[in-house]
Amino acid sequence: MKHELSALKPLFILLPLLVLGFVLFWTLFGGTLSKDFQFKSAPSEQFTQEEIQGAADVALRRFKYGFSGCTMTKLQYVDAYASSDTWNWAAEYNADEGVVFHSTFTTDDFFAPKNGFNPNDTYAYQWYVARSNGGHWKIVNLGQG
């Protein structure tokens, strides 16, 4: 039994180091916001500014941890695309409320191509964020448009 535990000792040392390395990598090399980043939000008939900010935070978090080599310059809430009685797109994702953000980001020449983006380019991206019963926001769709 003692011999089996000593054989696992390198694993107990290596595993935390790998986890730490992974966390540091995504912290240092994840998506970033530009120095002149702008978040634009017009008044909404459906959502408070706090609700819009909460949904925006979900999109920004996804950008931070999923878009290494990219720098976001703008994120804008578009009230006209919010899920509504006349166009309830959120229902397609089993949700009852949804908001849409338009963003612009640039890519670098090292990390971005590894994520499928052209190097040194600018992208317009949409983020569809939805929730049910006033619960937590989640991204249900995203992409160029």
What are these regions (language model features)?
Residues 122-145:
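Short beta-strand edge/turn micro-motifs at domain boundaries
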